[in-house]
């Protein structure tokens, strides 16, 4: 629907409904211009503003009232190569020789482009801040693999604290950073203390088991020391007859062990 404006009729130009009136001093923000009182005073009946099919009618009516291009500071889509589109994208064009909206898409599509990333062009300035991807938080949670967790748990059972060289060695073995290993041990110690406070009886059992393990390890060390001393006594050529008698008594008849004994007549191979 088009109408002939008094000032534009003298020039013989046809202006569409949504085109601003090319006044000498345009005042689109005045109440008289918004309500169309100027057109009523000039004898032309004021036409009602058509409703636009948009989810936000107030916003679309505001767009129709201001009559300014939405993507004024942003690049225009290549499809908008029409001379009228270039005129609409300029800042404050003085003449309106061509329609402002020569496109097939309704104005509601442009209003939707303010909310979502539309193919018409870039959204307004606040939209990229809303739609920007969330970056990974520095120092975020690190997920360890099952093998890494098992090795870390084994190391924690034997040693609650790690020295810097041990931490470096363990991190290199598990292909982790020293900071990750240090953080894991700190969290594991905190969990261990919390469980210790919640269940003191279970901690006593753990302490007794650890003491038993220490005793077993010490016994094994003592036995290995005795065995080494016996082997050294067997290898000694100046062993006493009492040691040889003890050796004969220690070796049972069912044993297949072969022992070399040095006597007055040389070495004999005694198979029992």
From Swiss-Prot:
Matching SMART domains: HOX
GO molecular-function terms, A-Z: DNA-binding transcription factor activity, RNA polymerase II-specific; RNA polymerase II cis-regulatory region sequence-specific DNA binding; sequence-specific DNA binding
Compositional bias ranges of the Acidic residues kind: 250-261
UniProt cross-references to PROSITE patterns, sorted A to Z: HOMEOBOX_1, HOMEOBOX_2
Induction line: By maternal wnt-beta-catenin signaling and tgf-beta signaling.
Cross-referenced Pfam families: Homeodomain
Tissues and organs where the protein is expressed, per its UniProt entry: First expressed in the dorsal endomesoderm of the gastrula stage embryo. The dorsal endomesoderm contributes to forming the embryonic liver, and expression continues in the liver throughout development. Also expressed in precursors of the developing thyroid gland, and beginning at the tailbud stage, expressed in the ventral region of the head. Also transiently expressed in the endothelial layer of developing vascular tissues of the embryo, beginning at the tailbud stages.
GO biological process: anterior/posterior pattern specification; cell differentiation; embryonic hemopoiesis; heart development; liver development; negative regulation of DNA-templated transcription; negative regulation of transcription by RNA polymerase II; positive regulation of Wnt signaling pathway
Region (Disordered): 222-272
Compartment(s) of residence: Nucleus
Keywords: Developmental protein, DNA-binding, Homeobox, Nucleus, Repressor, Transcription, Transcription regulation, Wnt signaling pathway
DNA-binding region: 137-196
InterPro entries given in the database record: HD, HD_metazoa, Homeobox_CS, Homeobox_DNA-bind_prot, Homeodomain-like_sf
One Gene Ontology cellular component: nucleus
Purpose: Recognizes the DNA sequence 5'-ATTAA-3'. Transcriptional repressor. Regulates the differentiation of both endothelial and blood cells. Probably plays a role in the proliferation of vascular endothelial cells during blood vessel development. Establishes anterior identity at two levels; acts early to enhance canonical wnt-signaling by repressing expression of tle4, and acts later to inhibit nodal-signaling by directly targeting nodal/nr1 and nodal2/nr2. May play a role in liver development. Induces heart development.
Protein name: Hematopoietically-expressed homeobox protein hhex
Source lineage: Eukaryota, Metazoa, Chordata, Craniata, Vertebrata
